[in-house]
Amino acid sequence: MSTPPKGGIVYHYSLDLAKLDQDRLTVTLEIDGLVPENLTFCFPKIVPGIYGAMDFGQYISGLTALNRKGNPLRVQQLDTNCWSIGQAYDLDKITYQVDDSWEEFGRNTTEGFYRSSASTFKDSTFVINANCLFGYFRGFTQSPLEVVFNKPSSLYAATSLVQTTHSPQQDVYQISSYHDLLDQPILYAQADTSMIQLPNIRVEVACHSTSGEKIAKEVAAFIKPLLLNQAKYLGNQLPVDKYTFLIYHHSDPQQNIYMGDGLEHSNSTLILLYMPLDQQVIKETVYSIASHEFFHILMPLGLHSHEIEDYDFNEPAFSRHLWLYEGMTEYFTIHMPIKTGVQTLEEFCTVLERKVKEMQSFDPDLSLTALSMAPMEKQDQYYNVYLKGALLNLCLDIYLRELSSGEYGVQELVGQLIQKYGPDRPFQDEKLFEEIIQLTGFTELQNFMDNYIKGTEALPLKEMLQKVGLSLKNGQITPSPKPSVEQLQLRRYWL
């Protein structure tokens, strides 16, 4: 059991998965350490990796606080997500019930509802995002936690969390901070796992399918070549040595509908699937989601500003660099297959054409930085970071290759930034653009960033593709009929 840091507290959480009642779990919190007279207990409004308000406090009911004599303390709900507790210096425990956030992963959803950040509870399966179950005291997000899950012996916990003690009916975890707890989802289900051992990294694939079939072995076979190619793309330098894929598959044989959702974490990804038990369809969906989410180990998980490092779960300050966190990640996702030789130029051009076409339906007068600073208010425009953001980085990649005679592109840029900063060394949000110019030595990038990231000028796609012997006309991208030696050489550097 953790000892409270000087002047701090330790959270001790416990719950029993075997006592699920009408989709609700009862959670108990006890505290060690010195606490102030008044405390505010909150559940997140939003969590890292999503950009819309989820208000996880809406799933909490019956919250009570007791003093050391077992008498109730005054509790007042301040808003959807927060409660004030009076005379907290005498606080012994808090109890409350948690309802699950979604009943089943399927087509019934609403815009802005990020189910991969939420939870569902069934007797045989629990998809757990800690932000749904466990709250925090304002001012104490850096305090350590102990979490005890009592459970049926039939349930296996798949997670990147490390169990400090384990028995068939109980798992105990010690976590360094609230942020670290929220960064590690858990899938409790009957065991269906497969291990992938690659150079320098060990990956667990844990699955649950409502079809009742075991699918982890097949899914791991899909993921392994993807990870090998991603490692190759990154120069065989991965920032983590352990990783977990948690995959929940809902099979509805009556519906010919395919959906997937995923959310990245530092050492894991949670993927939700709604589709028939069709290995090819599952492969294509998992491949697409897993590729994007795994690249997030670089950014923002490995490279980010203070706005993400010091994340406020209820009043977040947003970074202006979604063009990097999501746009660059998506560019790596679409660039990696052709760069590693598993995709043809024609296939790559088809992917780009789709991005170009979809981008046309979004507001061209909204800059990427303006979207990034107000994503909750601009939910209808948010998806453009995966379209315009990816195509922007394509332009930047070609431009850097041209300026450096092929020696330097966005892969090298991200590598340099991570080397200088990294997971525990956040950068100053407002200084990243000048930092990029200093790192690369290319002052020409100032106009590029002013025009296309901070500004609203149309991306120079046609011009940049022409530099590598590709023609963009009427939404179609095709090889130029008579490319020059210089164009072909730059294309080889790029692809």
Task: Report each predicted region and the residues it spans.
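Beta/coil-rich, acidic/histidine-enriched accessory regions frequently appended to metallopeptidases
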Residues: 1-4, 422-495
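Early extracytoplasmic/domain-onset interaction patches
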Residues: 2-46, 129-130
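N-terminal, post-signal-peptide region of Sec/Tat-exported proteins
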Residues: 34-65
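Non-catalytic architectural context of zinc metalloproteases
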Residues: 53-62, 66-240, 258-261
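Carboxylate/His-rich catalytic cores and anion/metal-binding grooves
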Residues: 172-180, 240-259, 326, 330-331, ...
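Juxtacatalytic substrate-recognition/specificity segment
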Residues: 194-321
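Acidic/His/Gly-enriched intrinsically disordered linker/tail segments
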Residues: 303-312, 316-389, 419
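Pan-zinc metallopeptidase signature
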Residues: 359-432, 440-446, 454-459
